[in-house]
Each structure stands twice: as structure tokens, then as C-alpha cells.
């Protein structure tokens, strides 16, 4: 059995595509860089306007159509949003239950690039996020954060350790 995942920025997502995705894709990655000001700064259209207002309702509809399962809102944190725990909380406030956020990869000369001196702040944000998640869980508003979902019995990368990597056993590009 092959598992298929698709990643989308949501711009062209419509009812027909959503139906296809729900029928054919095991998982969907919905790319949203963060809060409105963060996303729109990093993902403007050619005319300079942001994509946030267009894509968020589409993503909410898709997440609901999948019963809040088998998808991830996937954000990116940069030097512009080292307070990325606020982006995750924003996603939760929008009703999303499956989330991930990754550090940007870029040349160190890029103004948004993460620098070595940012690492302590990033570590603080992960601690802050863990505490916020505990509070949300107590309030009955819990959600999953991909990078905190570790198999304590098998470790995070058993398949990769056994095969040398996830390539060919977990994913193809």
C-alpha cells in the first residue's frame, strides 16, 4: 500500500480539488507560514497583497472535511517570527488540531535567516509552546504538535535507523 501526501499553499484549492484530495491523499500538508502579518510578509502575490485571507478559510474547510485528522498546518519560522509559539496558538485559535512549524532554510545573508544567536530564543519558544499546550489540554482545547509526537518505546526514527533513512521506506520526492 502506498501512502500519498500532498502539500499545498491553498491558492488554487477549490471544492473539486478538495474532493480529490480527500479521496486520493492519505495526508495533506497545508502551508501557512504563521499569523496574518507573518504569512503575508513571506508569501505575497505579485501585486503585493497577501495570501492569508484567501487560503485560511479554504484550509479550515479542508481540515473539517477530514474530521481534523490526516492533515497538518505546516508553518515556517524565520528571524521575523522567532516567537513562533504565538503562530501555533494562532493556528489553534483558528480551529486547527494538527500542526507543525519548521525553521526556515536560507543563506545567512538573507534578512529572514535564522542565526546562531537566535538558538536560545528558539529553545525558549519550544519550552513556552510545551507549557501552552498543557494549558490548552487542561481547558479541553488540545491539539497535536508534530515535533512533540515521539514514540517513547521506539524512538522518533526507528524506520530511518533500520533502513539508513526514510527514503524509499517512508517517502519519495
Regions found by a protein language model. Name each.
Residues 28-29, 56-59:
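A conserved non-catalytic segment of reverse transcriptases
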Residues 15, 54-57:
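Hydrophobic transmembrane signal anchors and adjacent membrane-proximal interface regions, especially
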Residues 37, 42-53, 60, 64-173:
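Radical SAM enzyme [4Fe-4S]-AdoMet core and its adjacent flexible, acidic
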Amino acid at each position: 500500500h502506498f501512502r500519498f501526501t500532498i502539500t499545498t499553499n491553498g491558492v488554487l484549492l477549490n471544492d473539486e480539488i478538495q474532493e480529490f484530495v480527500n479521496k486520493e491523499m492519505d495526508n495533506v500538508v497545508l502551508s501557512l507560514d504563521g499569523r496574518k502579518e507573518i504569512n503575508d510578509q513571506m508569501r505575497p502575490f505579485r501585486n503585493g497583497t497577501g495570501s492569508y485571507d484567501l487560503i485560511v478559510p479554504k484550509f479550515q474547510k479542508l481540515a473539517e472535511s477530514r474530521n481534523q485528522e490526516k492533515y497538518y498546518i505546516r508553518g515556517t519560522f524565520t528571524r521575523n517570527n522567532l516567537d513562533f509559539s504565538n503562530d501555533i496558538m494562532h493556528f489553534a485559535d483558528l480551529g486547527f488540531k494538527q500542526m507543525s512549524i519548521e525553521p526556515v532554510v536560507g543563506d545567512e545573508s538573507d534578512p529572514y535567516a535564522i542565526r546562531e544567536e537566535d538558538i536560545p530564543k528558539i529553545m525558549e519558544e519550544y519550552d513556552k509552546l510545551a507549557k501552552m499546550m498543557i494549558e490548552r489540554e487542561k481547558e479541553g482545547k488540545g491539539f497535536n504538535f508534530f515535533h512533540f509526537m515521539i514514540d517513547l518505546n521506539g524512538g522518533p526514527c526507528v524506520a530511518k535507523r533500520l533502513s539508513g533513512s526514510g527514503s524509499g521506506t517512508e517517502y519519495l520526492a
